[in-house]
C-alpha cells in the first residue's frame, strides 16, 4: 500500500502501474474538501515514485464519484471571497498535479461521474466507462459553475459547442452519447472495466497510444477560428438568455467565462474560472438553489424513513376515470404498480384510458419505450364499471368530482368492497379529510392523497393525515407515491391542506389589486418577469379553471372566515357568472385558441374589460414593488401560519411543496428561503405598510417575534474553514 486515506487509497498493481481507488466510508464517493486534501497527499506519494509508469483511477462503489459534497456548499459559500478563491486555487493545483504526472493516466468510470467527479476524470488522459455511465457538470442547476477546471478542460476536449451544451444546461449524458462527443474513450462491461483500463495504460506506456498529444490539447488555447468562436458563443449566449433568463446568472456567466478563456492556456483559463465561480457562490440564487437540493434530500430521506418497514403496494385502484384518474392510473402502471380504474360510465373510462394511452405514446415517440413495453404497461391498467378485483387491492385513491356528498358516498361504498387492511385515500384538493372520514367504519385506514395536474409532470403529492389516520396508512400511501416517482410530503388536515391553503390568499391579493384598479396584464407580467413565477395569477386561474377556483375559494372562505371571507364581488365571481371558465371553455381573463400543436394560446379579449369594470375601481398604475408585495405577503403569512399551527412540519417541507406543487420560483428557494434572504425585520416593515388591506396582511405573532431579532427560519450556517485546513496539504 503506497497511501491510505479516509476516502481513498493508492496501491501497486503490476509493471509500474499504480491504482488510486476512491472508497469513502459511506455508500457513495463524494469529492468533499477532505477527499480533495487526501488526493493531494496521494499525489505527494505518487510524485516520488521513480518506478511509476502509469496510474489508474477507479472506484470501489457502484458509482465512481457522485459529485461534490453539496452539504458543504452553504458553509463554503459563507467563506469570504478571497479565502474561497484561495481554496479553489488549492483544489485546482491538486487536479493540475494529477494531469501533469509524467506518466499516462486513465479513469475507469462506473455509474455516476458528476460535477467534481466529472472534473476529476477530465484531468486524466483517458476515460473508459461502463454502459451505466452518467457523466456531466450539473453545477449551473445549483446557481454556480464548474470550479475544478471543468469549464477549461471540457471545451478543449470536446470543442466549444458540445461543452457549452453540457455546462450551460447543467446536463449529464449517458455512455453512448459521451463516447460520440469524445468525453470518454471507450465502453466496456463492468466486469472488464479494470482490465480494459490497464490494457489501455499498457498501450500508452508502450508508445502505441500518444497520451502526451491527448494531454496537450487540454493545456492549450481552444482550437477555434475567430468566426467559429463568434458563432458558437453568440448562439450559446442567445440560447441561455432565452431559457435561463435574468434570474439565473450561472449559465450565462459560464458561457462568458469559457468565451473569455478560449484564447488562453490552462493556467490563465483556470484563473478566469476561479474569478467567475467565487462571485456566483455568494449570490442569493446559489444559496436558494443549493437549499432546494438539500431540502429535496431531506424530504426524500423523511419518506424513506417513514416507509422502511412497509411493504410496497402490489395492486392499486383509482375511483373516477377521466383526465385525472387516467393520469394517476398511467403513473402507477408506468412505475410498476398495476391499477384498476373504476368509474360509473363508459365515457369516463374511455377518457381515462385515452389519457393513459396518450402519455404512453409520448414515451414511445421519445424513444423511452418500445411497442412491447407500451402494450405491457397499458395491460396493467384494468378499466371497469364493477368492483371486481377490489378484494385484491392494497390501496385505493378516490378521484371523483370535488363534491363532499359524492366523495363520501363513493368512499363508503368502496370501503365495503375492499379488505379490512386496504388503505383508502382521497384526491380532494380542499375538502377536510376529517369530514370525508366521518362516513367510514375504518377512518384509521383513510387519508388524503392530493395529486397536482398534470399528474405525470407535477412532482408533488400532498399526503394528508386526518385526526384518526394511522401511521401505517400514511406510510403505505407515502410508499405508493414514492414508487410512482413522486415527492410525497405529509401535512396535517385543514381546509385546502397546505398548498391550496396558501395559494388562495395569493389569489385574494390578486383580487384586491384588481378591485383597486390594477391591470391584470401588468400584474401577470410583473409576477412572471420580475418575481419569476412560471405563470402570473390571471393566467394560472385560467389554467386551473375559474369555476374550480370559484368553488375552492368558497370552501376556503368557509374554513377560514376571519381572513378569507370577502365582503365584495371580485374578478373571479364576475368571470364565473359570465361562464368564462378559463382554458377549459376558451374564455377566461384571456381568450384561448389552439395553436398548430393543439395547445391553447392566450390572446387579448376586450370583452373581459366590461366584466372587470363592474368589480374594479378606475384603472390606476401600481409599481412593480407594490404588486409583488401585495401578491406575496398574504401567501407568505399563510405559509408561516401553517408552520406555526403544525400543518406543515418544517420550513424545508413547506418550501419544497411550494416549488414542486406551485412552481414557486426555484431561484428564490421557496417562501421561507425568500423570507430569510429578505430578512424577517425587513419583511415585517414591508407588510406593515399594507396591513390596512385586511387580516390577510397581518403578520403572524411568531414571525413578529423573529423580526424583533431579525432571526431566520433556516438555521444559520457557519462559514467553512477549508483553506486553513487544506492549504498545507
UniProtKB/Swiss-Prot annotation:
Catalysed conversion reaction: a (3S)-3-hydroxyacyl-CoA + NAD(+) = a 3-oxoacyl-CoA + NADH + H(+); a (3S)-3-hydroxyacyl-CoA = a (2E)-enoyl-CoA + H2O; a 4-saturated-(3S)-3-hydroxyacyl-CoA = a (3E)-enoyl-CoA + H2O; (3S)-3-hydroxybutanoyl-CoA = (3R)-3-hydroxybutanoyl-CoA
Region spans: Disordered: 708-729
Molecular-function annotations in GO: 3-hydroxybutyryl-CoA epimerase activity; delta(3)-delta(2)-enoyl-CoA isomerase activity; enoyl-CoA hydratase activity; long-chain-3-hydroxyacyl-CoA dehydrogenase activity; NAD+ binding
One of the GO BP terms on file: fatty acid beta-oxidation
Region (Enoyl-CoA hydratase/isomerase): 1-189
PANTHER family according to UniProt: TRIFUNCTIONAL ENZYME SUBUNIT ALPHA, TRIFUNCTIONAL ENZYME SUBUNIT ALPHA, MITOCHONDRIAL
Residues covered by region (3-hydroxyacyl-CoA dehydrogenase): 311-729
Subunit-level organization: Heterotetramer of two alpha chains (FadB) and two beta chains (FadA).
Site (Important for catalytic activity): 119, 139
Catalytic machinery residues: 450 (for 3-hydroxyacyl-coa dehydrogenase activity)
Assigned keywords, A-Z: Fatty acid metabolism, Isomerase, Lipid degradation, Lipid metabolism, Lyase, Multifunctional enzyme, NAD, Oxidoreductase
InterPro entries to which the protein is assigned, alphabetical: 3-OHacyl-CoA_DH_CS, 3-OHacyl-CoA_DH_NAD-bd, 3HC_DH_C, 6-PGluconate_DH-like_C_sf, ClpP/crotonase-like_dom_sf, Enoyl-CoA_hyd/isom_CS, Enoyl-CoA_hydra/iso, FA_oxidation_alpha_subunit
Binding positions (substrate): 296, 500, 660
Coiled-coil region(s): none
Superkingdom of the source species: Bacteria
Assigned protein family: In the N-terminal section; belongs to the enoyl-CoA hydratase/isomerase family. In the C-terminal section; belongs to the 3-hydroxyacyl-CoA dehydrogenase family.
Record function comment: Involved in the aerobic and anaerobic degradation of long-chain fatty acids via beta-oxidation cycle. Catalyzes the formation of 3-oxoacyl-CoA from enoyl-CoA via L-3-hydroxyacyl-CoA. It can also use D-3-hydroxyacyl-CoA and cis-3-enoyl-CoA as substrate.
Residue numbers binding NAD(+): 324, 343, 400-402, 407, 429, 453
Record bears the keyword Signal: no
Lineage: Bacteria, Pseudomonadati, Pseudomonadota, Gammaproteobacteria, Enterobacterales
UniProt keyword Isomerase, yes or no: yes
GO CC annotations on file: fatty acid beta-oxidation multienzyme complex
EC number: 4.2.1.17, 5.1.2.3, 5.3.3.8, 1.1.1.35
This protein's name: Fatty acid oxidation complex subunit alpha
Originating organism: Enterobacter sp. (strain 638)
Pathway entry: Lipid metabolism; fatty acid beta-oxidation
Amino acid at each position: 500500500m503506497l497511501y491510505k486515506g479516509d476516502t481513498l487509497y493508492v496501491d501497486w498493481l503490476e509493471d509500474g502501474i499504480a491504482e488510486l481507488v476512491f472508497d469513502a466510508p459511506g455508500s457513495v464517493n463524494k469529492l468533499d474538501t477532505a477527499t480533495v486534501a487526501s488526493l493531494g497527499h496521494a499525489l505527494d506519494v505518487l510524485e516520488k515514485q521513480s518506478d511509476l509508469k502509469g496510474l489508474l483511477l477507479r472506484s470501489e462503489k457502484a458509482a465512481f464519484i457522485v459529485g461534490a459534497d453539496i452539504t458543504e456548499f452553504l458553509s463554503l459559500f459563507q467563506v469570504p471571497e478571497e479565502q474561497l478563491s484561495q481554496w479553489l486555487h488549492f483544489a485546482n493545483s491538486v487536479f493540475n498535479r494529477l494531469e501533469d504526472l509524467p506518466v499516462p493516466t486513465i479513469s475507469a468510470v462506473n455509474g455516476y461521474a458528476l460535477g467534481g467527479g466529472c472534473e476529476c476524470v477530465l484531468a486524466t488522459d483517458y476515460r473508459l466507462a461502463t454502459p451505466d455511465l452518467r457523466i456531466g457538470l450539473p453545477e449551473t442547476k445549483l446557481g454556480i459553475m464548474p470550479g475544478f477546471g471543468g469549464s477549461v478542460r471540457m471545451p478543449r476536449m470536446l470543442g466549444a459547442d458540445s461543452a457549452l451544451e453540457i455546462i450551460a444546461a447543467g446536463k449529464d449524458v449517458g455512455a453512448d452519447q459521451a463516447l460520440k462527443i469524445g468525453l470518454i474513450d471507450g465502453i466496456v462491461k463492468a466486469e472488464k472495466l479494470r482490465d480494459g483500463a490497464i490494457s489501455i495504460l499498457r498501450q500508452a506506456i508502450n508508445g502505441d497510444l500518444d497520451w502526451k498529444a491527448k494531454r496537450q490539447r487540454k493545456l492549450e488555447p481552444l482550437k477555434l477560428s475567430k468566426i467559429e468562436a463568434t458563432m458558437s458563443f453568440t448562439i450559446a449566449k442567445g440560447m441561455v438568455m432565452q431559457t435561463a433568463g435574468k434570474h439565473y446568472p450561472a449559465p450565462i456567466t459560464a458561457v462568458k467565462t469559457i468565451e473569455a478563456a478560449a484564447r488562453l492556456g490552462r493556467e490563465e483559463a483556470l484563473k478566469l474560472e476561479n474569478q467567475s465561480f467565487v462571485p456566483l457562490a455568494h449570490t442569493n440564487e446559489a444559496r436558494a438553489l443549493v437549499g432546494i437540493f438539500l431540502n429535496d434530500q431531506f424530504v426524500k430521506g423523511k419518506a424513506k424513513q417513514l416507509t422502511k418497514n412497509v411493504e410496497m403496494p402490489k395492486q392499486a385502484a383509482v375511483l373516477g376515470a377521466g383526465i385525472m384518474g387516467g393520469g394517476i392510473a398511467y403513473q402507477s402502471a408506468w412505475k410498476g404498480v398495476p391499477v384498476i380504474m373504476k368509474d360509473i360510465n363508459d365515457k369516463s373510462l374511455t377518457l381515462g384510458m385515452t389519457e393513459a394511452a396518450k402519455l404512453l405514446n409520448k414515451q414511445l415517440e421519445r424513444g423511452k419505450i418500445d411497442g412491447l413495453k407500451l402494450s405491457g404497461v397499458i395491460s396493467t391498467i384494468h378499466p371497469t364499471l364493477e368492483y371486481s378485483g377490489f378484494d385484491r387491492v392494497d390501496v385505493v385513491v378516490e378521484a371523483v368530482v370535488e363534491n363532499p356528498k359524492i366523495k363520501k358516498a363513493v368512499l363508503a361504498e368502496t370501503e365495503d368492497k375492499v379488505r379490512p387492511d386496504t388503505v383508502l385515500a382521497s384526491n380532494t384538493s380542499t375538502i377536510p379529510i376529517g369530514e370525508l372520514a366521518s362516513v367510514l367504519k375504518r377512518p384509521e385506514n383513510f387519508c388524503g392523497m392530493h395529486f397536482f395536474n398534470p399528474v405525470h409532470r407535477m412532482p408533488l403529492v400532498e399526503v394528508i393525515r386526518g385526526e384518526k389516520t394511522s401511521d401505517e396508512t400514511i406510510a403505505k400511501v407515502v410508499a405508493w407515491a414514492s414508487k410512482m416517482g413522486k415527492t410525497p410530503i405529509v401535512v396535517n388536515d385543514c381546509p385546502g391542506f397546505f398548498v391550496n391553503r396558501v395559494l388562495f390568499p395569493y389569489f385574494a391579493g390578486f383580487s384586491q389589486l384588481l378591485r383597486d384598479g390594477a391591470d391584470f396584464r401588468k400584474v401577470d407580467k410583473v409576477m412572471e418577469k420580475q418575481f419569476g413565477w412560471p405563470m402570473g395569477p390571471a393566467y394560472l386561474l385560467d389554467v386551473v379553471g375559474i369555476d374550480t377556483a370559484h368553488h375552492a375559494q368558497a370552501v376556503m372562505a368557509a374554513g377560514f372566515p376571519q381572513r378569507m371571507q370577502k365582503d365584495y364581488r371580485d374578478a373571479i365571481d364576475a368571470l364565473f357568472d359570465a361562464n368564462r371558465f378559463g382554458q377549459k371553455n376558451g374564455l377566461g381573463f384571456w381568450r384561448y385558441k389552439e395553436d398548430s400543436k393543439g395547445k391553447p394560446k392566450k390572446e387579448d379579449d376586450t370583452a373581459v374589460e366590461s366584466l372587470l369594470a363592474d368589480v374594479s375601481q378606475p384603472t390606476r398604475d401600481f409599481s412593480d414593488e407594490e404588486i409583488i408585495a401585495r401578491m406575496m405577503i398574504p401567501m407568505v403569512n399563510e405559509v408561516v401560519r401553517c408552520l406555526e399551527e403544525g400543518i406543515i412540519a418544517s420550513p424545508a417541507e413547506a418550501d419544497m411543496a411550494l416549488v414542486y406543487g406551485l412552481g414557486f420560483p426555484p431561484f428564490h428557494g421557496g417562501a421561507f428561503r425568500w423570507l430569510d434572504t429578505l430578512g424577517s425585520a425587513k419583511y415585517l416593515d414591508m407588510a406593515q405598510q399594507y396591513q390596512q388591506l385586511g387580516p390577510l396582511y397581518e403578520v403572524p405573532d411568531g414571525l413578529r417575534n423573529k423580526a424583533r431579532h431579525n432571526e431566520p427560519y433556516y438555521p444559520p450556517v457557519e462559514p467553512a474553514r477549508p483553506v486553513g485546513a487544506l492549504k498545507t496539504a
